[in-house]
Amino acid sequence: MKTLQDYIDKLNKLNFKEMYENDFFLTWEKTDEELEAVWTVADALRYMRENNISTKVFESGLGISLFRDNSTRTRFSFASACNLLGLEVQDLDEGKSQVAHGETVRETANMISFMADVIGIRDDMYIGKGNAYMHEVVDAVTQGHKDGILEQKPTLVNLQCDIDHPTQCMADMLHIIHEFGGVENLKGKKLAMTWAYSPSYGKPLSVPQGVVGLMTRMGMEVVLAHPEGYEIMPEVEEVARKNAEKTGGSFRVSHDMADAFKDADIVYPKSWAPFAAMEKRTNLYAEGDSEGIKTLEKELLAQNAEHKDWCCTEELMKTTKDGKALYLHCLPADINDVSCKDGEVEATVFDRYRDPLYKEASYKPYVIAAMIMLAKFADPAEVLKKLEEKEIGRASC
């Protein structure tokens, strides 16, 4: 059983000074020690909450959330993270704001940020748009702070864009670290990031891209498996290849789900839309081509239906390492005969892994809180120490 001091000591050995007053866009833009700092602070905050130690580092302030796509886990994880640190959350509903009347990104970003310490954005639907929008928001608030309009520049946390889903993948990784007993035990472990059938179309690429972009940094043997025609962004594949070369791991693409699952230590079967189709979809929306969008949707649904055999079955799970691979999913999963007739995973597999799946999801609030804390405090180790010394209980009578 670790103590809070153990986490503080570990934090003091890491170099993460560039995270202070900075933003979190993509995991591969961060150093290994910066990622380690996020996991360490996340674990420290979890330890504190579980041991009734207050983690309130803000007496006031706002966490602004903007979701341009549906969300349950990430929405509540962001709200939980802000609350954990003492911030209140205000959700920006663009449909009810002046954005609907043509307000510029620069103006909106500054107007919502007068007392904001963090802005969390999900914008994952359109290739080439989401991450770019987040940078535009950061540029606006940076200039606002420089011009003396804003007292402080709120940090931005990417809650999922068109390229990466860093809070999800960092939470996934922290779950893996705990399941395998430390980062040092991950080298050589086989992870299968595989496409799986879904009766819906247009699921973002950011989860598989985020997974291969992060897991390849751990010296793991990462296999990206999908039917032909379901490629991810080529630049992310290149990131994964370079990571694998640097860490002594491996990265390869397979068009065989069974090949990916064979002897795998970790499996992550999840549906996504082809990069080429998502790119075409973005262009059709930009052109206002509603008929073209409908046609593309029919084509993609028909294409998906050709690959219903890409499902995480009991038989496939038996072929994994000792038949006991760790099953991951960002949730919600398409479960056979539960949420749909045919989907990503058989019900018996999902039911067997339900508890670890929920545990996997539970890391996300702490990961987000850690990202915020590392961006807002120059010496988070000292902040954690002072919180412990105050001896204020989170819940006290």
What annotation goes with each model-predicted range?
Residues 68-80, 177-291:
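Glycine-rich phosphate/diphosphate-binding loop of Rossmann-like nucleotide-binding domains
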Residues 1-76, 80:
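Positively charged, low-complexity intrinsically disordered leader regions
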Residues 395-397:
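Conserved small/polar residues in nucleotide/adenosyl-binding loops
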Residues 293-358, 366:
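Rossmann-fold NAD(P)-binding glycine/threonine-rich loop
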Residues 56-177, 335:
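Phosphate/diphosphate ligand-binding glycine-rich loop within oxidoreductases
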Residues 147-154, 220, 319-328:
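A short helix->loop->beta-strand "cap" motif at the edges of active sites that frequently abuts
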Residues 112, 259-260, 349:
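Structural alpha-helical scaffold elements that stabilize or flank donor/cofactor-binding regions
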